[in-house]
From Swiss-Prot:
A zinc finger (unnamed) spans 3-34. It comes from Rhodopseudomonas palustris (strain BisB18). The gene is nrdR. Residues 1-20 are annotated as: Disordered. Keywords: ATP-binding, DNA-binding, Metal-binding, Nucleotide-binding, Repressor, Transcription, Transcription regulation, Zinc, Zinc-finger. Residues 1-11 have a biased composition (Polar residues). This is Transcriptional repressor NrdR. Pfam families: ATP-cone, Zn_ribbon_NrdR. Its cofactor is Zn(2+). Binds 1 zinc ion.
Length: 161
C-alpha cells in the first residue's frame, strides 16, 4: 500500500479488525519511511461494474462517489454513519448481484432513492431533486405526492419547526 504522505511503498499493517457487520476490514497502517499513520478499508468486490451515464459514456462504478452523493442528501440529518454505511453496502450488493456487468446511472439512482426513502424522507426528496433534475416547485410536489400519508405528515411537521 502506497503511503498517502510520501508515496513510499514500504508500509506495515499495525492493526486489523472487522467492522460491526464484518463486511469490511479496517486496517491501521504506518509508513516505514516517514512514520505517517493512516487507515485503509478492505471489502469484498463480487464483480467489476460499469456505469452507463445518461450521455452513453461508460465509466467504472465508484463506490466512493455513491457514498458522497448519499452523504450530501443526508447533510444535517439525524442519521448515524453506521446506517449510511449499511445502506451503501446493501446498494452495492444489490448492484453486484443483479448479474449485469453494466448498469445505467438511472437504475442506480432509482435503487438509491428506494433505499433513501426507507432511511430518511428529507434525504429522499433532496436526492430526487438532483437525480431527477427538478426545475419547478411542481416537481417537488410530485415527489412529495409519492410519499405515503404518514411520511407526508412527518414532512409537514418538519416544515413547521
Amino acid at each position: 500500500m502506497r503511503c498517502p504522505s510520501c508515496s513510499s511503498l514500504d508500509t506495515q499493517v499495525k492493526d486489523s479488525r472487522p467492522t460491526e457487520d464484518s463486511a469490511v476490514i479496517r486496517r491501521r497502517r504506518v509508513c516505514m519511511a516517514c512514520n505517517f499513520r493512516f487507515t485503509t478499508f478492505e471489502r469484498v468486490q463480487l464483480r467489476e461494474l460499469t456505469v452507463i451515464k445518461r450521455n452513453g459514456r461508460r465509466v467504472p462504478f465508484d463506490r466512493d462517489k455513491l457514498v458522497r452523493s448519499v452523504q450530501i442528501s443526508l447533510r444535517k440529518r439525524p442519521v448515524e454513519p453506521e446506517k449510511v454505511e449499511k445502506m451503501v453496502s446493501a446498494i452495492v450488493r444489490e448492484l453486484e448481484s443483479a448479474g449485469e456487468a453494466e448498469i445505467s446511472s438511472e437504475a442506480i439512482g432509482e435503487i438509491v432513492m428506494e433505499h433513501l426513502r426507507k432511511l430518511d424522507d428529507v434525504a429522499y426528496v433532496r436526492f430526487a431533486s438532483v437525480y431527477r433534475n427538478f426545475r419547478e416547485a411542481k416537481d417537488f410536489e410530485a415527489v412529495l405526492g409519492e410519499l405515503s400519508g404518514d411520511e407526508m405528515a412527518r414532512l409537514a411537521a418538519l416544515r413547521l419547526k
